[in-house]
Amino acid sequence: MTKQVGKKFAWVIKNFSSLQCKKFYSVPFQIGDCKWRLSIYPKGNNCDYLSLFLEVADFKSLPSGWRRYVKLRLYIVKQLSTLIRKTHRWFDQEMWGWGFLYMLPLTKLHDEKEGFLVNGELMIVAEVDALGFIDPLNESEESEDPTQPLKKIKLNDDGAVSSDLLEEASPRKESMEVNGFQVLPSQVESVRLIFERHPDIASEFRAKNQYLRKACMDFLLSLVETLCQSLQEFSNEDLVEADIALTYLKDAGFKVDWLEKKLDQVRDKKEKERSCLAKLQETEETLLKLKQKCTELDALMDTEKAELSAIRTPLSFEDVV
């Protein structure tokens, strides 16, 4: 069962635990000028994790040299909360599918206490924001697909799906050059700030091809944006992907020692967060035990007060004679 509302696509897989196939596909759905589909490995893709990917369903029919830059959010909805994974990727004729190999441990997925499977059903929501594409006939332009009035799905605390009307339109945008890199107008200030603070960042970057130069700059901006996430949103997978992105940028010739230090700081803060969460959980458990003990002591005091009151009751005349 599927439902699409604007940029979000909801996919409910019934009898999920009964699936025997290695790979399972959703029906195609249209966002922008591409048809997309989700693919899932119910038993993991050679790992003990649920694997989930977004693919361009009609990539064979697209013109040679096509590219799409996509902001992707994948949600696995559970009863009380939602698992979210986010990434930013270029989709092209060589790499027309991206996703998460380690989306969710299978043991956690099938644990009834976790609440991912409800009556045997698994609900997945994909938010696909196709930001733009590079026209192979005109590399100086960067355009974005116009969006029509749409409804945006919101996930409630109980995992239900509701719809709010949201109208927005994105006009066609020209790319702009900043320090030799073609960027979108929305990226200009960020790129300028990077070069102001780190003027030699691209001094050893030798690529001349504008596609490659833009892809690398998008990679850099995505990495910075990733590091700006709150620690609560920052997952172990984000750390791994950030390391990969940093290595890619260094290999390409970018001087990103400053960014590596920031990543180390985030990694340290994430470790401290885990430690604090563990201590907090331990304190909460201790407090719960103390509260339980207080409740038991209150009940004991009430019993002893009643007993004392009974003992103090004076004898009546009839009791005495």
UniProtKB/Swiss-Prot annotation:
Report the Pfam families cross-referenced here: MATH_2 (PF22486)
Asked if the record carries the keyword Cell inner membrane, the reply is no
Q: CDD domains of this UniProt entry?
A: MATH (cd00121)
Q: Which UniProt keywords apply?
A: Coiled coil
The record, for PROSITE patterns, names: MATH (PS50144)
Can you give the residue ranges of the MATH domain?
6-128
The family database entries (InterPro entries) matched by this protein are listed as:
MATH-CC_domain_protein, MATH/TRAF_dom, TRAF-like
Q: Which residues form a coiled coil?
A: 255-310
Membrane-spanning parts:
none
Q: Is Coiled coil among this UniProt entry's keywords?
A: yes
Any idea what this protein is called?
MATH domain and coiled-coil domain-containing protein At3g58410
Q: What is the lineage of its organism?
A: Eukaryota, Viridiplantae, Streptophyta, Embryophyta, Tracheophyta
